[in-house]
Amino acid sequence: MRALSANLFAVLLMCALASVFYVWSALENRLERHKRGSSVPDGGSFHQGPSEDHSAKTFRALLAVPVAQRQNSAGRSKAQNLTNPSAFVGSRDYHVNGDDERSAQREGPVKLGYPVDDGIFWSNWLEDVLPVRFTEGYAEAWRSKARTSPVVKLEPGCGRISNQLATFADGTKACVRYGINADQVQGETLTYYLASLLGITNLPPLVLSQLNGDSAQWVAVRTRINNLQWSDRAVVSLTEWISNLTGVVTPAPLRQESSGLLPALRCFENKTTAELLELMQWSDLIVFDYLTANFDRLVSNLFSLQWDPHVMERDTNNLLKTPHGDLVFIDNEAGLVHGFRVLNMWEKYHHSVLSSVCVFRKRTMQRVAELHRRRDSRQRLLELYRDSEPLSQELGFLSDEHAAVLQDRIDQLYKHIMQCKEKYNQL
C-alpha cells in the first residue's frame, strides 16, 4: 500500500510539472509572438514571426535539460575562398540574386513538362526560376559590416525576451541572440554554416560578436546591456533583420491527412510555378531540419498534433516568407547541438517527416552525396566555420560525439534518397 501511494504521488508530481511547463511555454510563446508583431520606432513593422499562434511550444521546456559537455577544437584549418565582391550592404530590404528578372516567371503558369526529373528530382526549369536568396557575396559583405558597426540601440522585437533587436549607427538592424545557454548560439551559428556547406541559401546572414561595454561596437548601449544582465565577454550572434515577412502554413501534401511529397502525385500538374517553387523549398527545409535535428519547426507541429489537430493549419514555427514567396528559415537555435542532445526524444518525429518526402533538389542532394562519399562533414564544416568566423574559437565547435551524429544523419539521408530513387526512378 505504501509503495502504491508513493507511485501515485510520483505520477501526480510529474503531471503537475508537465502542466507548469505547458502553461509557461504557451505564455512565453504568446509574448514572443506579440513582440514580434509589434511596431518598431521608425514606423516599420517587424515581421519575424506570425502575430498569433495557439499551439504549444515544446522547445522552452526542453531548455531545462542540462548543458552537455562541449569541446573546443584546437588549430586552424586551411582557408576556403567564400567571398564575392558584389553585394548590397546596409539595406533593410530582402535581396535575392536576379529577383527582378525571375519574379514574372514565378507568377506565371507552369511550363510544359512534368515538374520532376529522373524520378525524384525537381526539374531543371524550376531550379532555374528559383533565385539565390542570400548570395555568398551579399552575406560576406553584411557579416563584414556587422562585425564593426556600432550598436546604438537595443530593444525587444526578436522573439524570446533574452533576444534583442539591435539598431546600428547607419539605421540598419539585426537580431541579437543571447542564449539561455551557449548551446543556442552555437547551434544557430553552426546550423548557418552547415546550410552554406549544403548550398541552402534561405538563412539570413549571421555573425558573432563578443559583448564588451567598453568596445566601440557596444559602448553606446552599455547601460542597456547591464540592465539585461548580459555577461561581459559573452559571445552573441547577430542575424540580419529582414522586413516585410509573413507566416507560412504547412502545404497540403505535407499534412497528416496526405500521403506526402511524392513524385507520383498527380496534383503537381495543377500547381502554379509559385506553388511548385514553395514546395521545392519545403523539400530543402525538411532535409535540412533532419540533418540538424531541429525539432522547433515542422517536427514540433507534428508532435503537437496529439492535443491540437489543427496545428498544421496555422503558421509554422520559425519559418517566414517574402512577398515573392521565398522561404526564410529563422531562429535555428534548436539545430545540431541542442537537437542532438535531445535526439532520443524526437527521432521518431524526424524520421516520420523525412519519410514523407521523396522529391529533392538535385543540387542539394549532390552535396549530400559528396559528404556521404567522403565522410568528411566534420572537417569541412569546421574549416568553413573557422575561415568565416573570427570568434569560432571562443564559441567552440561540435563535440566528437555530435560530429559523428551529423555524419550518421548524412548517411541515413543518403540511404533514404537511394530508396526513393529505387522506388520512383521508372516514373
From Swiss-Prot:
Gene that produces this protein: fjx1
Single biological process term from Gene Ontology: cell-cell signaling
GO CC terms: extracellular space
Localization of this protein: Secreted
Disulfide-bond pairs as recorded: none
Residues annotated as glycosylated: 81, 244, 270
Signal peptide (from-to): 1-18
Keyword terms of this UniProt record: Glycoprotein, Secreted, Signal
Function according to Swiss-Prot or TrEMBL: May act as an inhibitor of dendrite extension and branching.
Domain of life: Eukaryota
Annotated protein name in UniProt: Four-jointed box protein 1
